[in-house]
């Protein structure tokens, strides 16, 4: 289905507004203000600000270079080539190379003028200011990403719960008919969610981090532990009492998967369970010994899983998505 994105709308409105303002100011080459606006509208506020600064700096540098080259050497096509040969590496060195295209337009304006005057330089500065200013104005609006981030969070939490349910079932029954589709799916979800959360950070000029991004980083580390413990779980060939105890623990843990932080409760329960294991009679067979060793290792992995969550300060409950 055909859909017009918010960035397309902002670009169209911004371009028209920049050209209109330039015409009102009776600027020469007024259409170039629209080109500058198009180039400066980016997907995030921080990206737009960085691009605007790079283009403004590059354009100011281009005016200075143009004056030196054209007035001292002459208005000749080969002079433009020589100018760009020196100008482009300098913009790269100064890390304002994003402004090469915009500044090249300004250079061509000055070349076509046939004679650089203070009035014409002021005309170009106004074009640059209008184009960049309108782009920054358009980028003041950025749609909220909260709904998408919450949807990702819920799906990841649901997948964690499914994985834990399968671990619980295996420890209780030894059945292993799970397709495991949630593993690659969760990996993909976490990657996409982190990218989206980073975009959200970039949309807030005065904010360098946010809870959503840290939340998905936390889940990523926890998921690495889940992937690591799965082979250990499936190596257990018999059902033992300790396995049933861990299964009950995992059942309660999966019921409490949420963005808040209650890890300390489960860490205490885990410590108590570890002590209880140590006080139980020694295994009678080799199989039981191997099963209990694997389960003890599983306790250590679950502890790491919970420690990671304990460092996260939590996200307050959000309203239903509806």
From Swiss-Prot:
Keywords: Cell membrane, Membrane, Transmembrane, Transmembrane helix. The chain crosses the membrane at residues 24-44, 68-88, 100-120, 125-145. It is found in: Cell membrane. GO terms for cellular component: plasma membrane. It is a multi-pass membrane protein. InterPro entries: ArAE_1 (IPR010343), ArAE_1_C (IPR021062), ArAE_1_C_sf (IPR038323), UPF0421 (IPR052984). PANTHER family: MEMBRANE PROTEIN, MEMBRANE PROTEIN-RELATED. This is Uncharacterized protein YqjA.
